Amino acid sequence: MDPSLIKVVNQLQEAFSTVGVQNLIDLPQITVVRSQSSGKSSVLENIVGRDFLPRGTGIVTRRPLVLQLINRPSASGKNEETTTDSDGKDQNNSSEWGEFLHLPGQKFFEFEKIREEIVRETEEKTGKNVGISSVPIYLRIYSPHVLTLTLVDLPGLTKVPVGDQPRDIEKQIREMVLKYISKNNAIILAVNAANTDLANSDGLKLAREVDPEGLRTIGVLTKVDLMDKGTDVVDILAGRVIPLRLGYVPVINRGQKDIEGKKSIRIALEAERNFFETHPSYGSKAQYCGTPFLARKLNMILMHHIRNTLPEIKVRINAALAKYQAELHSLGDTPVGDNSSIVLNLITDFCNEYRTVVDGRSEELSATELSGGARIAFVFHEIFSNGIQAIDPFDEVKDSDIRTILYNSSGPSPSLFMGTAAFEVIVKQQIKRLEDPSLKCVSLIYDELVRILNQLLQRPIFKRYPLLKDEFYKVVIGFFRKCMQPTNTLVMDMVAMEGSYINTVHPDFLSGHQAMAIVQSQNSKPIPVDPKTGKALTNNPVPPVETSSSSGQNFFGSFFGSKNKKRLAAMEPPPPVLRASTTLSDREKTDTEVIKLLIMSYFNIVKRTLADMVPKSISLKMIKYSKEHIQHELLEQLYKSQAFDKLLQESEVTVQRRKECEQMVESLLQASEIVSNV
């Protein structure tokens, strides 16, 4: 297996970290999770072979530490051992050093300085209290004594806030850890103390939440030497307690007394090897125990994992690169050239697109909803047409109103025939009712044009120039409102025109004779039939002849009703308000029904006419006019101020986003080049 695969991932991590992004691509990495005081720091230092991690009480690791170990042979070509002084302390040498990504080019040969820099960089982001931050620190260590490996050291899980710790510190750490270990490409290194119940391990519990089958979790058992006499971890190693696909590795760490006494890691690793080789439970499997085996195992697991996921990583890098390149293209380059020409081109493009959207020729036609001109057609043929067809003239005009108008139009002498005056009065009143829905149609079309305007102003170019967008909106809205005035006037004139002349010879109008025939056919009584013989019964009784007194009530009786003879003889003056009575004579019934038929017939003609002509008027005065003159209006208004520099001032969001996209593209191009060589 080629160790350079791990270096590839390290290079990708650095490429993405330079733009401040850690989650752009899900890279293979080993994440370390554990409870506090489980011995995690000692495990990592044993793998490195150096003391370099901050130590103390409470939460010491307060930022993720991406630890990149690079195996680098010594300059002499020999595998130099880490030297110790007379007190057993590790000595620094020129073949081992550390480098921080935030301090490029600066080498730390003294590992105590590395610890100090970790503390300093942590406090720079989190302060000197016990707050935490998810922004990682990148540390690369070169040494001939390490295997090429990358580990992400995460803050230890805690339960109860201590001292100045935030009350929700447990939640903060849990969310941070889950953010790292929930990625499918993350190998979880769960560090657990062997002298505690494994079922209560916080690290394993959290790992099982995101990896319930234990497919990408490897367990590390620390403090094996501190277990009660007669107990061991053989059952755990055999997978009989909590099985993990990648298994467990037992290790021995330095105790607190050893650390305080500056016991070298080289000596501690030798003691670890002797412990496992001489222990009755582990002697036969000593080669699978200890820190050196753990490092080799992690190295092999990570390399296999990288090899398996590398094709997917290449695909994701290329997809992300295409995405950010497209966004960068939509944001456009920094404007170059004459600003007046730029504004002219924007006006031309906007007006052309406005026409295509209204005409339904846009390249971005939706398959899920109506848009543009289709919505205008819906207003014309569904909302407006159905709206005026639903208006019933007899919603407001009752039969009694019709009779009253009939009598009023007759003047002082009762009319022998039904005149046209009453018909025209009622029809004109009802035609006037069609004005409001017609004007409402104009308003709805205005709303649709504004909707199209807002749709066009959502284009990336207008997000780039917010002041120009505001000016476009103001000018076009004012233009639409100017278009509404002559449109409303024309529509009102059309309604008034229909009411100014009642064309009773219209070919579709029902004639008086036809209306009378329809009413008589509806009112004709069927001839009774003998149920036995089936023949018509002709011996009907002759209806009584009306007396002069009863016939005299055909007209006036409906107003005055019946009165006693004494009051009639007194000839009292009529009341201030006269209303028709509810009693109708046969003639009144017939006249009322006939005029209702005539009103409905003519009103339907007018409704059909307006349903056809109002959309045509709006199309002429608003839609067609706006398509032809919107460009002239924009040119006139925008060029009047000559404030092109101000209009083309880019928004801070656009400038910042372009910078971010440029950095992303540069980073992804670098990443693409890295993986293309593998």
Swiss-Prot record:
Ranges of residues in domain Dynamin-type G: 24-311
Residues covered by the GED domain: 592-678
Q: Where is this region: G2 motif?
A: 60-62
Q: Would the keyword Chaperone turn up in this protein's UniProt record?
A: no
Sorted UniProt keywords? GTP-binding, Motor protein, Nucleotide-binding
- Residue ranges, compositional bias (Basic and acidic residues): 78-90
- Give the region (G5 motif) as residue ranges: 252-255
Q: What is this protein called?
A: Vacuolar protein sorting-associated protein 1
Q: In which organism is this protein found?
A: Schizosaccharomyces pombe (strain 972 / ATCC 24843)
Lineage start: Eukaryota, Fungi, Dikarya, Ascomycota, Taphrinomycotina
Q: Which gene encodes it?
A: vps1
